[in-house]
Each structure stands twice: as structure tokens, then as C-alpha cells.
Design a protein with these regions (language model features):
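Flexible "arm" and connector segments at domain edges
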Residues: 1-109
């Protein structure tokens, strides 16, 4: 699916269900992502690693579950941004926050 098809599909789904339904679904998907991340924390083989991808790629089921949940959350976020008409504003805010964090990192080094 190309980007245009993806966006058209997001719009169709968002318009069908509406903000109330999809905002509640987003909350559910975020909770599922939280649970998946927590499961990975409990796996001892990943303790004290900054980059878990050092360990055999995506072969662990906990990582695969996180990938699935990230996809669900991103799909729902795309719908919410469309429904609220705030995609551009979110991108601006992300850029601002990234630059601010890089400044903080630079000051601490």
C-alpha cells in the first residue's frame, strides 16, 4: 500500500467510526502497548541493554508483540490526528520537542 492509499484508508476508517469510538480504541491500544513493553522488561535477557536489537533481531516474541502494538497505536493516532485536523500541529510539536531534548543532551555532555 502506498502513502496515498494508506491515508485514504485511515480517513475511511476514521470517518466510519468517528472520534468517540476511535479515541476509546486508541486508549485500549496504548494500554496494550504498555503491557507489551512491560513484558519485555520482565525478560531477564534484556536487562541493562540499551539496544535490544543487538540480540538476534526480532526473534523474541516479546519484541514481535511490541511491533504489533506500535503499529496499532500509530494507526489509531493517524485517525485521531485526521479527526482533530491537527496533523501539521503535531509534526511541529514533535520537531520542537526533539530539538529541545537535543539541547538538553548537549548541555549535559
Amino acid at each position: 500500500m502506498n502513502q496515498e492509499e494508506y491515508q485514504n484508508n485511515i480517513i475511511a476508517i476514521a470517518n466510519h467510526y468517528g472520534y468517540d469510538s476511535q479515541s476509546r480504541q486508541l486508549i485500549e491500544e496504548m494500554a496494550e502497548l504498555t503491557v507489551a513493553i512491560n513484558k519485555l522488561w520482565r525478560v531477564e535477557r534484556f536487562c541493562d541493554r540499551k539496544n535490544i536489537m543487538d540480540v538476534n533481531g526480532f526473534s523474541y516474541p516479546e519484541v514481535k508483540e511490541i511491533i504489533e502494538e506500535i503499529a496499532d497505536v500509530e494507526i489509531m493516532l493517524s485517525q485521531i490526528k485526521y479527526l482533530l485536523g491537527c496533523k501539521y500541529e503535531v509534526e511541529q510539536e514533535k520537531e520542537r520537542k526533539i530539538l529541545r531534548q537535543l539541547e538538553r543532551i548537549e548541555k549535559n555532555e
